[in-house]
Structures are given as structure tokens and as C-alpha cells.
Amino acid sequence: MSAPSETLLPVRLLPPCLLIVTVEVDIEVEADWNRWYDDVHLPDALACPGVRAGRRYVSSGEVSESDRGEQRRLRTRLYTTVYELDAPSAVETKEFAAMRGWGRFGPRVRSQTRVVVAVG
């Protein structure tokens, strides 16, 4: 059963493509990174051709993840943004390539990006 603070969203058809970005952020830069992401990066990404929507999520505390049978516990919060795209080519536009700012956080922000394409 869902916690009272959660909202059940209606089921929708999978868009043609999803871009899923998962990020670990060191606590020392977390507030600055969140300001930049919310005020600059996310609006810039949503303005790119072929990007339909984006939604951010954050873990409530430590998380455990497994990859190919290996399990690890993260002591940092885990951020995930899911973007709905018209096609995988949306990440290849000049507007998407022109987005800047991620590098200023250097090794304090570690990310993994996946593109998921709907079949059928």
C-alpha cells in the first residue's frame, strides 16, 4: 500500500523513447548542484527539440542497488531524472549538445545514462 503522501499517477503508454539519468552527488555540492539542475539544466533540457517532458526523483536516504549480481550500498542520495523523448536522436541535436555546466562539479557528481526505446 502507498504511503499517504504518495500520489498514484495514471498508467500511460510508454513514449517512443526514455532518457534515464541516475546521479550520485557528494553532499558538499548537493545544494549548489540542485539549484543549477532545477534552475538551469532541466529548463534547458526541456527546451530542446524532441524532449517532451522530464521528471526528477530523489532517494529518501541510503539506497542499495545491484548490477549484474553485484550489490552495493550508496551513502549518498541517488537522483534520477526520466525524460520522455520523441526519438533517441533528441540527444543528438545541437541544442542538447550545447547544454553546459555539468563539468563544473567534476568528480563530485557521478552519473549513468540510459536510453530506452519502446518497441512496437
Where are the language model's segments positioned?
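Macromolecular interaction modules
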Residues: 1-120
